[in-house]
């Protein structure tokens, strides 16, 4: 029977499959360096079982050093395939190689222990088979023993004394057979040995008071897990005499060699102490040992039967081999130092060090009744060993308040701390890089003060009650009033009883203590502090005219009477679908009269508004698989390509088109809106690559890279064909006729980018989009929307919500600005002075949508969850404001005046388009 390294799964052992550790180290590929950044990975195929390594960023010399455990047989052929992973097309095969496991085992004497193999990678193309590089792999953890040799004729009779009874085995079927010896507690090992091997001392047993006992606890304990099987060692069976009775373990040569496991040295005492050590197998004792006064090691003795199996001529020379056991009493063999153990550190409690028949040191954990090859070390500081309710051992790290199944060592803890330190350094460097345009904290105190710097010779202090006062070092006096609020040095003094003060927004006003009144007019010259200075910026848009024209078309085509819609709140979606699809499209232009079953409400407009809100929340819910979120960082919707799983999906999209058209026709708003590219498709406008960034940033960046780089120099092999996966099914699509055979070059890559952009917006949703637009056009002709753009259509459909300025200010955070910074004061002044449409445009510019969550500004969502509206100080006063819709952040440069801030903000809101990356 073939044996190999121990495995945790005993079912594979019985089925003949063994575990092999395959370490894919590295590869050297004969290919040009790829600047596109493809990832390389290796695929290992073993009898239909496929395992893959991680992806390596190196395109010519990838390194993995990844260990894969596979189930093999001695006749298995390992197949290695090296692949190049691409984002825009299918993975490309770079080369493959095979390993005949049977041939490798024969080459390395049926033992694979860290065997390094250099495999030649090859690839078949139109020119034949070409060499594409080399792959380095390491095979480990597999040992195959010799096949059984049956030869009963040469086996002498064997007598085993057990409880005073003699058991004979001489090939006679009538005789009793020798019982099997237990190994590893579960798998029995045949007690026969081939003609070329003998039983090692790990299988020895002793007779104590006539009872047959194992020679060591290791016969019951399990062998160390994940360790290769020890080689068979030829040594003699031992015979110990206890209380006048002897026992011996002899082997027949008619069976195979079993799996051996490490065991402690066999010792026995009979008024004499004997310590045993490992000796080289099958070696004659020195001549001086025959007259030694001490009993030699039992493991060093070789019996006549075992000796004859190895060397037939050795019988005459070793007739007195058992006489060595009977030595004078009182002799003690001196303890021999174990050369293999140089570590003098004490073992933890409950651990024991032992040696197997090969002289290898292993360790026994009596706490868990397990063995291991690695020397146990005490737990690092702050760690604790515990056992859960199911008896499993785990370890608690009180330093980080975490748990793990793996026993920690000082080295593993040190490696983790080193990795954590490197990660913190990298994060610090990235933070410094991201803040390269920001101002230092020392500059913020003076610039954020709305009153500016103090006059020369003045100092601002705080007393013990945290009250601010000012010191005039010129006159050596103090005062509570801020000298900057009492007029400038070149201004005329205020009249008697007047004082200058400032509002929270930083606007100056005057207090007349004589009449106890306040005013914004300066009593010295009559000028108002709130007068709008500078040229007025024209702000005119035709949206109101467009909306009025659309409302006129709707009213002109409205039909008399009304149409009843009777629905239940529990089955709102299905009831509405059945009733709307049962009506004629022109009947949906009548005034709506909505009835909720079981409720007595009369619809004078309020129930219809609620019906539109609730139904839009239902039909656009991504859980129905009809729509999906357009991106990871927003909650706008687009058609889901996987909606085809519903056999009636086209009818539902036609219903949704009618419903959206009804909302526009009757002037109602829906709960959730679509993405801007979807609105452009409704308006029959051409979609550009800029529109792609808001829904698929990774795809957009890939196309931009192709546009800005020379793909021929990078060696990219792209064709006018693309693959798409929907519900696990991969389909191929040609961007143009015969595109799978047309190579993308520098001359035609612009056409390729345009076709890829068009395909990305329409992939898998052509029929759904057509059904939606057909249903929409039945109620509201699409020609009525030709004057609007996509942003105006979103405002019409989702509504222009009245913004709560107090809620907006209360849920706004500032970075490198404070609430009292003059730029922040000017910003909120600008928001208050503009109308609701400009506020919606500003909100859409910063957050990507003009709609707010149900909880207002406090529940604005960003890329990583809730993200409040943020204003950050970035750049110079000549820059335009920038927005980060993923984080709801506005980059507001430090403008010098309110007029400059207002001009830049309006220009950014109205005239800018698209996204960019810093």
UniProtKB/Swiss-Prot annotation:
Active site residues of this protein: 886 (glycyl thioester intermediate)
Domain called C2: residue spans: 1-116
Region Interaction with ERBB4, annotated ranges: 345-525
EC number, UniProt record: 2.3.2.26
GO biological process: lung development; negative regulation of DNA-templated transcription; proteasome-mediated ubiquitin-dependent protein catabolic process; protein ubiquitination; T cell differentiation
Enzyme class: transferase
Membrane topology, as annotated: Peripheral membrane protein
Summary of the function given for this chain in its UniProt record: E3 ubiquitin-protein ligase which accepts ubiquitin from an E2 ubiquitin-conjugating enzyme in the form of a thioester and then directly transfers the ubiquitin to targeted substrates. Ubiquitinates and promotes degradation of SMAD2 in response to TGF-beta signaling, which requires interaction with TGIF. Ubiquitinates ERBB4 isoforms JM-A CYT-1 and JM-B CYT-1, KLF2, KLF5 and TP63 and promotes their proteasomal degradation. Ubiquitinates RNF11 without targeting it for degradation. Ubiquitinates and promotes degradation of TGFBR1; the ubiquitination is enhanced by SMAD7.
Identification of the protein by name: NEDD4-like E3 ubiquitin-protein ligase WWP1
UniProt source species: Mus musculus (Mouse)
Gene that this polypeptide is encoded by: Wwp1
